[in-house]
Amino acid sequence: MNLTVYLSGEIHTDWRQKIMQGAKDHGLAIKFTSAVTEHEASDAAGDVLGKDDNGFWRDHKSSKVNAIRTKNMIQNCDIAIIRFGDKYKQWNAAFDAGYCAALGKPYITLHAEDIIHPLKEVDAAAMAWAQTPEQIVELLKYVTSDS
């Protein structure tokens, strides 16, 4: 089974690379997509439309430009993996989870046990909760297997 998997969330660790490498190591037929993970590039996505000294309007333009990419990728994915890290609050990841839920797209959350409570609604709509990228790879192995 060929799948497209959208990787959403925390950008400060190598969890995406671990999942992609694990899928490659197991020969899984998976195409991975993701939002722009370079923070500065994402923040500047709307600058092409004109510089803005007001932080709100700069962020507003950039979020709309970024949404062109993320909305299409979420709409076209088979599964989303949504990572919530330990250090920062990932509002974008929570938004992506809600969008997946609204579209009926299955998603798996990836986060530590100590943030279960604040993510209870996000986890309730998820198909699974994993704590490590290795668990995600095992789940992907299972859902792509022919048996």
Where are these predicted regions, by residue range?
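Conserved catalytic or regulatory cores that recognize and/or transform ribose-phosphate-containing ligands
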Residues: 1-147
